[in-house]
């Protein structure tokens, strides 16, 4: 039986301290099984890991936060083209609900993306999530773009690390205001900031 989900769309300034602490706990539990390092950014009540989202879709059920997706509008560079996008990140579904939350969260977010007037939304996820993201793209909402790496700045300055990192990730693009045929070609996306 599917749990009853209640979806909340909120701007970052609308979140209370209690929202941040509840989300931080959700992210630690959701990202922790993929490695301790992945849960570390959410210590101390942080409900973001790199760049802070401007808008969030949060799914709740009887047990609290069940799913989450964050959005940040930004300019990225794909090949030689500068492009306004809505970056989608901080995707998460509580482990006991996997398979139920991501599709619903993008469906809640999609009308908002249209209202924001962005040409595309994009997200980058681990290759291990190919099946999950593939299900999302099956209905034509998005396209997995293969062979693209993403370069980002680190969220903090570390004297022992370079200021940027380039990752081989799975890139998914959602055409919003323009058709997918207008997504620029290129093998590198420059985020020009930290990942969401």
Swiss-Prot record:
Role: N-acyltransferase required for nodulation. Acts in the production of a small, heat-stable compound (Nod) that stimulates mitosis in various plant protoplasts.
Gene expressing this chain: nodA
Top EC class of this enzyme: transferase
Annotated EC: 2.3.1.-
Entry's Gene Ontology cellular component terms: cytosol
GO terms, molecular function: acyltransferase activity
InterPro entries referenced in this protein's UniProt entry, alphabetically: NodA, Nodulation_prot_NodA_CS
Keyword Zinc: no
Family per record: Belongs to the NodA family.
Name assigned to this protein: Nodulation protein A
UniProt subcellular location: Cytoplasm
Keywords tagged on the record: Acyltransferase, Cytoplasm, Nodulation, Plasmid, Transferase
């Amino acid at each position: 039986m599917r749990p009853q989900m209640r979806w909340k769309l909120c701007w970052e300034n609308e979140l209370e301290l209690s929202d941040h602490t509840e989300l931080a706990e959700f992210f630690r539990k959701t990202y922790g099984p993929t490695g301790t390092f992945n849960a570390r950014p959410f210590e101390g009540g942080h409900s973001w890991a790199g760049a802070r989202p401007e808008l969030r879709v949060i799914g709740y059920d009887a047990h609290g936060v069940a799913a989450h997706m964050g959005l940040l509008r930004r300019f990225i560079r794909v090949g030689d083209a500068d492009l306004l996008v809505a970056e989608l990140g901080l995707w998460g579904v509580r482990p006991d609900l996997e398979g139920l939350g991501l599709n619903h969260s993008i469906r809640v977010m999609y009308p908002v993306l249209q209202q924001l007037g962005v040409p595309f939304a994009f997200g980058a996820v681990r290759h291990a999530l190919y099946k999950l993201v593939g299900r999302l793209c099956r209905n034509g909402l998005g396209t997995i773009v293969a062979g693209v790496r993403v370069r980002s700045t680190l969220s903090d300055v570390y004297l022992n690390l370079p200021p940027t990192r380039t990752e081989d990730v799975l890139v998914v693009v959602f055409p919003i205001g323009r058709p997918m045929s207008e997504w620029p070609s290129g093998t590198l996306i420059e985020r020009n900031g930290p990942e969401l």
